[in-house]
Design a protein with these regions (language model features):
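Oxidoreductase cofactor-interface core, primarily capturing Rossmann-like NAD(P)-dependent enzymes
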Residues: 2-28, 33-38, 55-58, 62-65, ...
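Conserved Rossmann-like nucleotide-binding pocket used by diverse enzymes
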Residues: 4, 50, 268
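Residues lining the SAM
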Residues: 6, 73, 104, 269
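A hydrophobic C-terminal alpha-helical subdomain
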Residues: 11, 226-287
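Rossmann-fold cofactor-recognition segment
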Residues: 43-55
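Compositionally biased, low-complexity linear motifs
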Residues: 64-69, 283-287
Length: 287
């Protein structure tokens, strides 16, 4: 059985590959990357490295050839670009006879008002249309997304948010990677939708948990979206990023990530890493 992971040199993709290598021979594993030179270390460990670029569909036919089980990791970029890139990958999977597609989606994708949901809605629909058995891994929110705020808190800054009492199912990328690996090698995942959500917490509860890890109080600063935009600008975020980060706060406030589910533990076969332990890992990583 040949398994392929796209975006295998990215933050999530590299963790999925490492998770797979713990229990699977390297000879069963193929990675598809835009720049094969970046995957030289994997090649040296016996993993087959192929070039695959979501912007160049002709490269994907070669990349996906002979693959049984495929993980499409959602790309970065604006919504329109991502929709086209993902469509290219899905069509190539169909052309090359891939037998199973796992795809990293977003929480509650089909009903989500999250500004990042449209590419996931389009991609899930495109995969279903192929008739290929699938599993949608609806990843809630990476704890790593909060590293900037964690660094600020370590340096003495307050935890700034305009997300109000909106709840998030934060978890470590490693947990999401382990879940993806489990679906790629496990049985019974055909035509499934998994809501991969950690225990739901508000921003205040996350800041309190971080304070427990750091051994100090972290003041919470609830602001308006307009104030949040100004603060982000003052921290040096580029102008084009500001509406995105504000939109994320707004969608959290409106409950787009408030998805309660035990799918994560079911897929992992273990509990999600507890939030204090997860925060401790990130704090150690930063310092």
């Amino acid at each position: 059985m040949k398994i392929l992971v796209t975006g295998a040199t990215g933050k999530l993709g590299s963790k999925v590959v490492e998770s797979l290598l713990k229990s699977n021979p390297a000879s069963n594993l193929v990675v598809s990357v835009r720049n094969p030179e970046k995957a030289e270390e994997l090649r040296n460990r016996g993993v087959e490295v192929r070039q695959g670029d979501f912007d160049r569909p002709e490269t994907l036919d070669h990349a996906f050839k002979g693959i049984d089980r495929l993980l499409i990791i959602s790309a970065d970029g604006d919504n329109e670009t991502r929709i086209q890139q993902h469509a290219n990958a899905v069509q190539a999977a169909k052309r090359t006879g891939v037998k199973f597609i796992a795809y990293t989606s977003i929480a509650n994708a089909t009903e989500s008002k999250n500004l990042m949901a449209p590419p996931h809605v389009a991609t899930e629909a495109a995969i279903i249309k192929t008739g290929i058995p699938y599993s949608f891994l609806r990843n809630n929110w990476y704890l790593e997304n909060e590293i900037g705020s964690i660094q600020g808190a370590i340096a003495g800054a307050p935890w700034v948010t305009s997300a109000g009492e909106g709840k998030v199912g934060w978890a470590l990328q490693q947990d999401y990677a382990d879940a993806a690996a489990a679906v790629l090698v496990g049985d019974g995942h055909e035509n499934t939708v998994y809501e991969l959500s950690g225990p739901l917490l508000t921003q205040d509860e996350l800041a309190t948990a971080l304070g427990n890890v750091l051994g100090k109080d972290i003041p919470l600063q609830q602001v308006s979206d307009e104030q949040y935009a100004e603060i982000m600008k003052s921290l040096g975020l580029p102008d084009f990023v500001i509406p995105i980060v504000v939109g994320i706060q707004e969608s959290i406030r409106n409950g787009s990530l408030e998805v309660e589910s035990n799918d994560f533990e079911k897929v992992l076969g273990r509990p999600v890493t507890p939030i204090n332990e997860a925060l401790n890992q990130l704090v150690n990583l930063i310092s």
